[in-house]
From Swiss-Prot:
CDD domains: UBA_EF-Ts
Involved in Mg(2+) ion dislocation from EF-Tu as annotated region, ranges: 81-84
Subcellular location: Cytoplasm
Organism expressing this protein natively: Mycoplasmopsis pulmonis (strain UAB CTIP) (Mycoplasma pulmonis)
A Pfam family the protein falls into: EF_TS
Family, similarity comment: Belongs to the EF-Ts family.
Protein name as annotated: Elongation factor Ts
Function statement: Associates with the EF-Tu.GDP complex and induces the exchange of GDP to GTP. It remains bound to the aminoacyl-tRNA.EF-Tu.GTP complex up to the GTP hydrolysis stage on the ribosome.
InterPro entries for the chain: EF-Ts_dimer_sf (IPR036402), Transl_elong_EFTs/EF1B (IPR001816), Transl_elong_EFTs/EF1B_dimer (IPR014039), Transl_elong_Ts_CS (IPR018101), UBA-like_sf (IPR009060)
Gene label: tsf
Organism placement in taxonomy: Bacteria, Bacillati, Mycoplasmatota, Mycoplasmoidales, Metamycoplasmataceae
GO function term, MF aspect, one: translation elongation factor activity
Gene3D superfamilies in the cross-refs: 1.10.286.20, DNA helicase RuvA subunit, C-terminal domain (1.10.8.10), Elongation factor Ts, dimerisation domain (3.30.479.20)
Length: 294
């Protein structure tokens, strides 16, 4: 086999696997230029590379919320750096995962990971492959899907930078209202949808703090209760969606905005890239010193 034939096989292997030039060259050399065996070699080598990176922390990446027909999904795909989250391979993977999730049913992350995409790889296999080809740990972290009933509408919002996404499910037919509240959720990050969801322990703790207020001192019991109620409502507006002033029309609460538009809040969900992941603190001076000693 001459050099041009070898170069042609390397080119073909790169097109098939999307692997780097040196990896394809090595795969063909290791398999005596058998294309099928070289593909298998790259797959196994990719799994080994991914396994080596499995202990790394992937806290960057992108989130996305999307709607197709009567289905909606929200998911997070992580990388180790924001730079990688902007490259074409990562963005293509986001597109493929989004399409696969919205087209298929899943009840858990395990079932979501095993959904097949258009390239005949499962989501888990695709992220493993991406880890090998990109060179960073790529992690499909979480996902949720809604399949809507006839009287339901859902609003989806993904911030332009891809770091925040939200879904808001309502009983009603007004898609614009649902999307507007989804945008509100992304911006204001409420902890609870309604006051009924706030743990009683948290309510009692707030009341105990408010009772220390000088504004209550010397007031009759009835007036104290009125002031206390006002303080509590103001506090709830900080972290309860329906109590919050609506960002597009602050004279209305979100609850009032929904009622005015014949919509009833059913469920909300908001993802932010990396939330809850403990990032490793890097001491660059120590790291450089350690490298110099090697």
């Amino acid at each position: 086999m001459d050099a041009s034939q070898k170069a042609g096989l390397i080119k073909k292997l790169r097109e098939i696997t999307n692997s780097g030039f040196l990896d394809c060259k090595k795969a063909l050399e290791e398999t005596n230029y058998d294309l099928d065996k070289a593909i298998e070699w790259l797959q196994e080598n990719g799994k080994a590379k991914a396994a080596k990176k499995s202990g790394r922390i992937a806290a960057e990446g992108l989130v996305r919320a999307s709607v197709k027909g009567k289905s909606a999904v929200i998911f997070e795909l992580n990388s180790e750096t924001d730079f990688v989250a902007r490259n074409k391979e990562f963005l293509d993977l986001m597109d493929n995962i989004s399409e696969a999730l919205v087209e298929n049913s899943f009840q858990s992350m395990e079932s979501a990971e095993n959904i097949f995409m258009e390239n005949d790889l499962t989501i888990l296999e695709a992220t493993t492959k991406a880890t090998a080809t990109i060179g960073e740990k790529i992690s499909f972290r979480r996902a949720k899907k809604f399949d809507l009933l006839e009287d339901q509408t859902i609003g989806a919002y993904t911030h332009a930078n891809g770091r925040i996404a939200s879904l808001f499910l309502v009983r009603g037919k007004n898609e614009e209202v649902a999307k507007n509240v989804a945008m509100h959720i992304a911006a204001m990050n409420p902890e609870y949808m309604s006051a009924n969801e706030v743990p009683q322990e948290k309510i009692e703790k707030l009341k105990a703090e408010f009772l220390k207020s000088p504004a209550l001192a010397g007031k009759p019991e009835k007036i104290q209760q009125s002031i206390l109620s006002g303080m509590l409502n103001k506090a709830l507006a900080e972290f309860v969606l329906l109590n919050q002033p609506f960002v597009m029309e602050s004279s209305l609460s979100v609850e009032q905005y929904l009622k005015n538009n014949k919509s009833e809040a059913l469920e909300m969900i908001r993802y932010e890239v990396g939330e809850g992941i403990e990032k490793k603190a890097v001491d660059f001076a120590s790291e450089v010193a350690a490298q110099m000693k090697k």
